[in-house]
């Protein structure tokens, strides 16, 4: 009855997607990015690096599969956004999007190899330093609080913006953090927070963005290990990412995705696509 009412009301309905979804075989890359060795990363590049490791402090195992899950699902988004195809459209809104320069800058460095904890942190430190040294931005798929400290150490004197997650450092700028019993809940007035961010930001320092899926309201965080009451809606997160995108960002770490959590497959794919589109 509700569907019939919507149709009769004259609202514009989203057209059904008739194009076949791609079936990829072999090596997957994020957004169909070109594979590249780290020594060939150039200034202005967005260098994707996977961190397929479990966060032992997280409530559930499965985060190690997040980089692969994002690469697999981002193929669908990249298939529509890649300028080599004739129909670059947003997969949900069906609106034209501009991808000029994206695929020239986007490159996939693969994953950091499994090993001892010391070796993993050393490899992440070296990679982050090298990417930052040439003036590129590191997009880290996966991570943890401890791995984020390694990134901060690599970006000496950096400022950190944290979307979601549990506050760790009062000097960081927190957007919709998870309540931990002692932290003050951030003002929900987005305009006031944006003004506060402008005052907090020091352009002379590197900027590190920690993007945890717990930033989203519960209805959008089905795959997050730490579901929450409240949180931001999609428009608010998009607004924040657009604001951050106006600054020179040295590294972005995406955490909180656990593709093994039970739930409907369509919800899982939808959330991965949403995160891919936002990034």
Positions of PLM-derived features:
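Short, hydrophobic/glycine-enriched beta-strand segments
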Residues: 45-51, 161-162
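Mid-sequence, gly/pro-rich, charge-dense loop/helix-turn segments that line enzyme active sites
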Residues: 160-185
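Generic enzyme active-site microenvironment
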Residues: 143, 162-164, 210-212
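Glycine-rich phosphate/pyrophosphate-binding beta-alpha loops
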Residues: 57
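Catalytic cores of soluble, metal-dependent hydrolases
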Residues: 4-47, 60-61, 65-138, 146-154, ...
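Gly/Ser/Thr-rich helix-start
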Residues: 51, 143-144
């Amino acid at each position: 009855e509700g569907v019939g009412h919507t149709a009769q009301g004259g609202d514009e309905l989203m057209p059904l997607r008739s194009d076949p979804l791609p079936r990829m075989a072999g090596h997957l890359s994020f957004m169909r990015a070109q594979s590249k060795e780290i020594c060939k990363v150039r200034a202005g590049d967005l260098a994707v690096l996977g961190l397929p490791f479990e966060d032992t402090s997280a409530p559930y195992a499965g985060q190690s599969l997040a980089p692969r899950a994002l690469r697999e699902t981002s193929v669908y988004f990249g298939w529509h956004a890649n300028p080599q195809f004739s129909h670059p459209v947003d997969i949900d809104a069906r609106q034209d999007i501009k991808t000029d320069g994206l695929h020239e800058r986007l490159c996939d460095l693969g994953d950091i190899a499994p090993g001892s904890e010391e070796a993993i942190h050393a490899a992440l430190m070296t990679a982050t330093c090298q990417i930052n040294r040439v003036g590129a931005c590191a997009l880290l798929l996966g991570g943890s609080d401890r791995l984020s400290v390694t990134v901060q150490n690599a970006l000496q004197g950096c400022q950190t913006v944290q979307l979601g997650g549990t506050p760790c450092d009062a000097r960081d700028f927190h957007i919709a953090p998870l309540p931990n019993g002692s932290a003050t809940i951030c003002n929900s007035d987005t305009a006031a927070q944006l003004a506060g961010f402008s005052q907090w930001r020091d352009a002379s320092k590197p900027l590190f963005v920690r993007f945890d899926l717990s930033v989203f309201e519960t209805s959008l965080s089905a795959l997050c290990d730490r579901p929450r009451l409240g949180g931001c809606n999609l428009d608010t997160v998009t607004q924040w990412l657009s604001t951050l995108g106006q600054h020179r960002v040295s590294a972005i770490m995406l955490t909180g995705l656990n593709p093994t959590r039970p739930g409907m497959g369509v919800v899982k794919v939808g959330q991965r696509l949403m995160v891919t589109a936002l990034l």
